[in-house]
Amino acid sequence: VKNFDVVTFGSAIADIFGTTDQPITNNSFNYKIGHKLLIKNLQFDIGGGATNAATAFSRFGFKTGCVCKIGDDNNGKDILALLKKEKISFLGSIGKGKTGVSIILNKKKVGRTVLTNREESDNLKSSEVKPFKTKWLYLSSLLGESFIAQKKIALKMAKQGTKIAFNPSEYLIKSKDIREILKVTSVLILNEEEARLLAKKYKKKGPLLHSIRSLGPKIIVITNSNYPIRAYNGIREYSIKPHKIKVIERTGAGDAFASGFVAGIMANYQIEKCLKLALKEGESVLKYFGAKNKLLKKNIRQ
């Protein structure tokens, strides 16, 4: 059985980026049914929470594994090639179906719309996961069979002393009961919307950081677009202001921030230093297309 510093468990997706000049009305892309939509700057990349975070951890010098399910197709081969290039062990499985795909439609200075087809990403059974041991298990969002497998493995490993980092998405919080995972979570990272949703779902009142910590996580980090990022460890609150930067594309920035923070904790940094590292990592991704091509390369493993 292989030993790791950290194993990421989540989706592996082929990302297709396109930019449009389509007008925006009422916060929506304005296009008629039946019309063609012209896009520019078409780019292909590998995405998904598991591969994004794994790349970040590996570049920070940690021995990294990745649990995800891909299809038996060219996109799946590209994902395996990326993991190999980034020195990440593939601990998941290859299904008979297709690899998941996201189409990311960008409008300069406005934002993006993402169309996602998750395919094999959500079809992973726990029996298909290769056995491993790890100090940290980083969970990003999965649905279907894969969520059941992820939860089962996370709860089992937490009992054996593995630390859990959790970065749940809005759709996961809405659609699944995640309380059991939260109870064993060492680090929980989410954005303001996700945090509000979580507090509301489990009827937690009072200041967000405190109310969510009562669900079990030892350290909570809440990001909030251009507003200060806040963290709480049950003793004191910390905050850091994002820098004013030119945002080119947001895909993968959340994964980069979250894995940057967890990498800092793994390197025994103080929380303030973890926030600085996370911010630097997240902002390195915001300035370019693609979720991981500009992730930092810096060995911080102790």
Task: Show where each model-derived region lies.
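Conserved phosphate-binding/catalytic region of the ribokinase-like
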Residues: 1-6, 16-20, 173-174, 205-302
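Glycine/charged-rich beta-loop-alpha catalytic/anionic-binding loops adjacent to active sites
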Residues: 30-41, 79-84, 236-246
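Alpha-helix C-terminal capping segments
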Residues: 54-63, 106-107, 264-268
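Short, conserved phosphate/pyrophosphate- and ester-handling motifs at nucleotide-, phospho-/glycolipid
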Residues: 57, 191, 254
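A glycine-rich beta-to-alpha transition motif near the start of alpha/beta enzyme domains, typified by
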Residues: 64-90
